[in-house]
Amino acid sequence: QWSSSAASDVYKRQPIEHGAAIVMHSLTKYIGGHGTSIGGIIVDSGNFDWSKNKSRHPNIWEPDKSYHGAVWGDAVPQLTGTNIPFIIRSRVVLLRDLGSTLSPFNSFQIIQGLETLSLRIKQHCKNALKVKEFLETSDKIEKVIFSTNQDSFFKENADKYLKEGKGALIGIELKGGLEAGKSFIDNLKLFYHVANIGLSLIHI
């Protein structure tokens, strides 16, 4: 009942509607859209029954010594009237212990990207289809990997969950194997070879 959505269509997928209880998403990719800030988000649907199999969730049901013995599974519903002990514990314990929070400036940058998310995702998906179709005409490419391909491992799920666009990630297998791939990367002039994805920039 978890959904890790870093590389998927963030605009219309809505994993909670399909049964996910907790959704984790990278803010650095499509949401930020500009690659200037690193961040992530956790969304707790409040739909998960933490009372079942309590032994599997000791962080929720065992007394937390760092909070005077509080039992999050009991305390959060009593104090807030909500079923979100996971996200409350994440905020007050993990945030306290790890300091994993955005600075005000990085938060501002993420919000700036969020304002144009719906427009960018639609265009990302349209562009990806065009690029896929173009790459399929190249005699230097062995295979184009995309979620809509009939032989794609992801096609069934893409058709089921990605109603407003099939995502914007494209993979290719070059003829010539590893050496051809190295040569391709080394000779890029327009594209940047980076680890990040989902930006309004040209990356590979």
Regions found by a protein language model. Give the residues of each.
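Conserved protein kinase catalytic core
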Residues: 12-13, 31
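Active-site C-terminal subdomain of aminotransferase-like
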Residues: 22-169, 173-200
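Single conserved hydrophobic/aromatic residue that forms the stacking wall/gate
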Residues: 1-7, 11, 202-203
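As written
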Residues: 7, 19-20
